[in-house]
Amino acid sequence: SSAASDVYKRQEEYNGKKFGDTQDPLLVSVRSGARASMPGMMDTILNLGLNDVAVEGFAVKTGNPRFAYDSYRRFIQMFSDVVMEVPKSYFEKIIDEVKADKGVVYDTELTADDLKELIVRFKAVYKEAMKGEEFPQDPKVQLMEAVKAVFRSWDNPRAIVYRRMNDIPGDWGTAVNVQTMVFGNKGDTSGTGVAFTRNPSTGAKGIYGEYLINAQGEDVVAGVRTPQPITQLEKDLPECYSQFMELAMKLENHYKDMQDMEFTIEEGKLYFLQTRNGKRTAQAAIQIACDLVDEGMITPREAVMRIEAKSLDQLLHPMFDTDALKAGEVIGEALPASPGAAAGKVVFTAEEAKELGKGGKGERVILVRLETSPEDIEGMHASQGILTVRGGMTSHAAVVARGMGTCCVSGCGAISIDEEAKQFTLGGYTFTEGDYISLDGSTGKIYKGDIKTVEATVSGNFGRIMAWADEYRKLGVRTNADTPADTKNAVRLGAEGIGLCRTEHMFFGEDRIPKFRRMILSDTVEKRVEALKPIGEFQKADFKAMYEALEGRPMTVRYLDPPLHEFVPTEEEDIKKLAE
């Protein structure tokens, strides 16, 4: 409490403004500052300090009443959602009703008077949800409650899931940053954006990002509007662009890593809101690490330490078969937000993805959403790929998908989606739940049907990183392999031998399992010896091929481990067939 009061005083002194002032009120944002970056997982509150009186002073100061009332409307909505847990959907519904009444399509078409009406209705929703308590007018109370809420959001379900997936300790806790507000929605010389100093999908050097003119930061990240590429800023606001490029390079040289930066331009003046080391795909991580070594910024040892070992798994993910891809029918194209090839059944909710996909029934699913929100994280994790109608390359879906190594195509405005009826139309076709589509996250192309994928190959920079890793590592690495093909692959990827060969896996092939079952079902010793002969032959051939592939490297063989009932069928039809 005393820390929050201290912040309150310091902000007023530093800015030379007062909270709740009737002429020029001080407004702040309250956001988290955890030790590890967790994009979209924790809560932020903007425009704090507005109340029924301050909003009028703000309208006078900015000379833009529409903007002032829109800021207040957003604050009530965010404060209610984050601090008091009044669901967002209540407010979205009211906005849709008012837009329908006024006969407009976009939020931006609502007038100052329309927004005043929204504010009255929003405060009524707050009062009802809070059992008669009015929306707080004292900025001190607003600040205290907001700070407490951001601390609490460390333990919200999506943040817990994200930490579990990324091995971030729960006891680290978070900090809360209180920043003076700057506004990107003050007209055509204002804007807001997110940019990376290198491409987070491929690692290519050069500014990569997006911005929206006349918008607040939340609009870019939430994926509600699809933004402009950063290069367009050079045409719109050339001075800001050159200053931005200079500062972006300065930040990268200081942190010696690719930066993910949020910025706002307020009436032609550029502000950086935050910078952090950017989330990237494994492919980009390798490219960036090698480039930074070549540019003399880091050493090879640092390059190896920068790459998360488990992320390298992404590079061995499948790609589309070239011939199958040529034959495939392209039904749409959008933004290539996270690379990779994905084909699977269409699902429309994160819950269905979780139930059917990885960790559930194990089917291949593609999650199709209007836009994803942080609550969808588990469903995104269970999907082969993600397709969104709204949002850009820096939207929540794109950032989280890249971090997970999941293929993602975003901002496909050509899709007409009906989430209730569980169907969407694209390229003249209608797709319902369970239909197959394929996504190419490297090109942004969307294909009809289930396109065949093939194993990936190891590229040049991957080899460089692995060679550096070999130089510095102390451990020897062997692999699990049960077939000659797996063994060849393991040797190709640098394994020093086979740590475990599980012999039972040799029997699961379609042509082999019947022979093994015949041995299990033999009712005399003679029949069993007879049935073992073909098994011995294919096992001998497998071992021979594996030893040849190993070229003298060691192999540990485990004899039959599972109980025999695991080799017999469980489906009614297969049992019948076996009995016959």
Sequence positions of predicted segments:
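Nucleotide/phosphate-binding sheet-loop regions of phosphoryl- and nucleotidyl-transfer enzymes
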Residues: S1-G328, E363-I366, S373-E378, Q384, ...
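C-terminal domain-closing interface element
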Residues: L273-T275, T432-N480, D486
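Solvent-exposed beta-strand/loop surfaces of large extracellular or lumenal domains
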Residues: V409-E420
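Protease-associated
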Residues: M297-S383, K445-I446, D450-I451, F462, ...
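Active-site glycine-rich loop that binds ribose-phosphate moieties when present
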Residues: Q423
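Residues forming the flavin
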Residues: M404-T406
